[in-house]
Amino acid sequence: MADQTGRASLHAVVSGIVQGVFYRRFVLQEAAELGLSGRVRNLFDGRVEVEAEGDRQKLEQLIKRLHKGPPGAQVTDMATEWTDPRGEYKDFRVDYD
Protein backbone atom coordinates (compact mmCIF):
# COMPACT_ATOMS: atom_id res chain seq x y z
CA MET A 1 0.00 0.00 0.00
CA ALA A 2 1.28 3.50 -0.72
CA ASP A 3 -0.15 6.98 -0.33
CA GLN A 4 -0.47 9.50 -3.17
CA THR A 5 3.17 10.58 -2.78
CA GLY A 6 4.43 7.01 -3.24
CA ARG A 7 5.34 6.65 0.43
CA ALA A 8 4.49 3.45 2.27
CA SER A 9 5.13 1.59 5.49
CA LEU A 10 6.65 -1.89 5.62
CA HIS A 11 6.48 -4.35 8.50
CA ALA A 12 8.78 -7.36 8.06
CA VAL A 13 9.62 -10.27 10.33
CA VAL A 14 12.77 -12.10 9.28
CA SER A 15 13.49 -15.72 10.27
CA GLY A 16 16.65 -17.81 10.11
CA ILE A 17 20.13 -17.14 11.44
CA VAL A 18 19.56 -13.43 12.00
CA GLN A 19 20.69 -12.87 15.58
CA GLY A 20 24.33 -12.77 16.63
CA VAL A 21 25.46 -11.97 13.07
CA PHE A 22 25.17 -8.14 13.13
CA TYR A 23 21.87 -8.30 11.24
CA ARG A 24 20.37 -5.28 13.04
CA ARG A 25 23.44 -3.17 12.29
CA PHE A 26 23.21 -4.29 8.66
CA VAL A 27 19.54 -3.25 8.49
CA LEU A 28 20.37 0.12 10.07
CA GLN A 29 23.07 0.80 7.48
CA GLU A 30 20.96 -0.33 4.53
CA ALA A 31 17.91 1.67 5.63
CA ALA A 32 20.02 4.79 6.17
CA GLU A 33 21.58 4.39 2.72
CA LEU A 34 18.09 4.19 1.21
CA GLY A 35 16.85 7.22 3.17
CA LEU A 36 14.23 5.28 5.15
CA SER A 37 12.96 5.85 8.67
CA GLY A 38 11.85 3.21 11.16
CA ARG A 39 13.32 0.66 13.54
CA VAL A 40 14.75 -2.83 13.78
CA ARG A 41 14.75 -5.10 16.84
CA ASN A 42 15.39 -8.67 17.91
CA LEU A 43 12.40 -10.75 18.91
CA PHE A 44 12.58 -13.21 21.79
CA ASP A 45 11.96 -16.18 19.46
CA GLY A 46 15.12 -15.55 17.41
CA ARG A 47 13.53 -13.57 14.58
CA VAL A 48 14.15 -9.91 13.71
CA GLU A 49 11.38 -7.34 13.24
CA VAL A 50 11.75 -4.40 10.86
CA GLU A 51 9.39 -1.43 10.60
CA ALA A 52 10.32 1.02 7.85
CA GLU A 53 8.71 3.98 6.12
CA GLY A 54 9.62 5.83 2.97
CA ASP A 55 9.39 5.64 -0.79
CA ARG A 56 7.74 2.36 -1.86
CA GLN A 57 10.50 1.58 -4.39
CA LYS A 58 13.19 2.11 -1.73
CA LEU A 59 11.30 -0.20 0.62
CA GLU A 60 11.21 -2.86 -2.09
CA GLN A 61 14.99 -2.49 -2.41
CA LEU A 62 15.26 -2.92 1.36
CA ILE A 63 13.31 -6.19 1.16
CA LYS A 64 15.83 -7.56 -1.34
CA ARG A 65 18.68 -6.54 0.95
CA LEU A 66 16.96 -8.07 3.98
CA HIS A 67 16.77 -11.41 2.14
CA LYS A 68 20.52 -11.29 1.51
CA GLY A 69 21.62 -10.05 4.94
CA PRO A 70 25.18 -9.58 6.16
CA PRO A 71 27.90 -12.26 6.01
CA GLY A 72 27.00 -15.03 8.46
CA ALA A 73 23.25 -14.48 8.22
CA GLN A 74 20.98 -17.06 6.65
CA VAL A 75 17.44 -15.85 5.99
CA THR A 76 14.98 -18.74 5.70
CA ASP A 77 11.69 -16.82 5.67
CA MET A 78 10.32 -13.30 5.69
CA ALA A 79 6.76 -12.20 6.35
CA THR A 80 5.92 -8.73 5.04
CA GLU A 81 2.93 -6.43 5.40
CA TRP A 82 2.35 -3.10 3.63
CA THR A 83 0.37 -0.22 5.14
CA ASP A 84 -0.03 3.49 4.64
CA PRO A 85 2.78 5.51 6.29
CA ARG A 86 2.06 6.83 9.78
CA GLY A 87 5.01 9.22 10.02
CA GLU A 88 5.97 8.07 13.51
CA TYR A 89 9.73 7.77 12.81
CA LYS A 90 12.13 10.65 12.12
CA ASP A 91 15.16 8.43 11.47
CA PHE A 92 16.11 4.77 11.51
CA ARG A 93 17.17 3.19 14.79
CA VAL A 94 17.97 -0.08 16.52
CA ASP A 95 15.68 -0.82 19.47
CA TYR A 96 17.31 -2.82 22.26
CA ASP A 97 14.40 -4.18 24.26
Report each predicted region and the residues it spans.
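Intrinsically disordered, low-complexity, mixed-charge
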Residues: 1-97
